[in-house]
A protein has these predicted regions:
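FIC/Doc superfamily catalytic core
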Residues: 1-196
Length: 196
């Protein structure tokens, strides 16, 4: 894809006002955007790794991680979306849904409701389902899951060993696994998360 705002069929397109939030004037193609976002994500990941051991199950951390991951590229990074989407909860419900999710995860951890992998994958799935940000929700949710599973003593996930922003078989498997989780079957997403 060369057009800057072309999206894969299964991705969430940006609204015109969200597109205006692009901070990098050198970004003119989809490849440029992917490169800029990946560089910003890498810096966000390094920042998050330095914070190991600190509480990540807060709404402030959810937003700050997104800002650290995408803040060099998008002015709205770290801000919840204000528009409707074909996926996710209504924009007005995002803060309450994120707070409920974080409460649920704290409960799961405290009471050993699920093993560490399943706890982190459930966090990932629910964050994607809420879809709190204009863009970057899958990448952000995968980072949150990796951070949580590491806090729980397990290695980070491989997520199919591929760049899931690229259209291809791995992305299709990931989307299918998310759809299975939507139907309360977590096994495909757990398997995919640990696959290389």
């Amino acid at each position: 894809m060369s057009d800057l705002f072309d999206e894969p069929d299964d991705a969430t397109p940006l609204e015109p006002e969200e597109r205006d939030g692009l901070l990098q004037s050198w970004v003119t193609t989809r490849a440029d955007l992917n490169e800029a976002e990946q560089a910003s994500i890498d810096k966000g990941a390094a920042w998050a790794r330095r914070r190991r051991g600190r509480d990540m199950l807060s709404e402030d951390f959810v937003r700050l991680l997104h800002k650290r991951m995408f803040g060099e590229v998008w002015a709205w990074a770290g801000s919840y979306r204000r528009t409707g989407r074909n996926i996710g909860v209504g924009a007005c419900r995002i803060p309450a849904e994120v707070a409920q999710l974080l409460d649920d995860v704290r409960y799961w951890v405290e009471h050993d409701t699920y093993d560490p992998d399943e706890t982190a994958v459930r966090l990932h799935h629910r964050l994607v389902a809420i879809h709190p940000f204009p863009n970057g929700n899958g990448r952000h949710a995968r980072m949150m899951a990796d951070l949580l599973v590491q806090q729980l003593g397990r290695p980070p996930f491989a997520w199919g060993g591929a760049d899931l922003t690229d259209i291809g078989e791995k992305r299709r498997r990931y989307i299918n696994a998310l759809q299975s989780a939507d139907r309360h079957d977590m096994a495909p997403l757990l398997t995919f998360a640990r696959s290389a």
